[in-house]
Amino acid sequence: MELNLKGKTALITGGSRGIGFGAARVLASEGVNIHITSRTAADLDAAKKKITDAYKVTVTCHPCDLAAEGAAEKLAAEVGDIDFLVNNAGAIPQGTVVSLDEKTWRKSWDLKVWGFINLTREYYARMAKKKSGVIVNVIGAAGERHSSGYIAGSMGNASLMALSRALGADSHKDGIRVIGINPGGTETDRQVVRWRALAEKQFGNAERWRELVTGFPFGRLGTVDEVANMVAFLCSDASGYTTGCVITIDGGASHIK
């Protein structure tokens, strides 16, 4: 399928690794010029090299901490107008309502929840002026499959699902589409490190980590590309009637009791 994205511009937060990097790479393969953010400049430089070695697009790196006050406004001023915003940065730690202290809770929400909100506010206004744009929020399936052991993540993700649905329900009036994506278990570097540690503990052999995920749908984790391809599709006019919804990519795990 031809997505007709060549020459467009996208900003992907958390774009140096994992799903964010995957989204940047897939969009670049479609001819989209890329802006990526991360808190680590070296990671951004490595991601840029991988993309520009493979595709003839412009990749601009923006080292920044989107949890900082005023960071979204500053980033938007640096990047300028774009066609697609992919909010992806941020990871919320495990923990119960008792074990997670307020400082940790607030810090994680400052990056993921407020990071998404603040950049959406900045770019929604810009996109509305030109009556065109797509905002994709890469959230997480815990927002719909809640866990008391992941209380901050469940609540934070649920709030971003509400943002995507509420804003996207009326955004057509401004020529904008807003969509959420909820990845389930996905084979990112970060997740593989976690599974390898569990395999080392259980089997004494980190290389056996795949044995621990056979209980997932299809006997495996999802791949980064399976999420990244959806990001690219949602950005395209091929998905031009899609807004105000959240698409779950978890192999059906959310429906398993």
What are these regions (language model features)?
Residues 30-46:
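Conserved glycine-rich Rossmann-like NAD(P)H-binding loop of the short-chain dehydrogenase/reductase
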Residues 173, 187-215:
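A glycine/serine/threonine-rich, flexible loop-to-helix segment
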Residues 136-159, 164-173, 185-186:
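Catalytic loop of short-chain dehydrogenase/reductase
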Residues 9, 16-18:
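Conserved glycine-rich cofactor-binding loop
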Residues 19, 145, 232, 243-257:
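Short C-terminal tail/terminal secondary-structure segment
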Residues 125, 169-170, 240:
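Alpha-helical segment proximal to the catalytic Tyr-Lys
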Residues 91, 98-118, 132, 136, ...:
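Catalytic Tyr-X3-Lys loop
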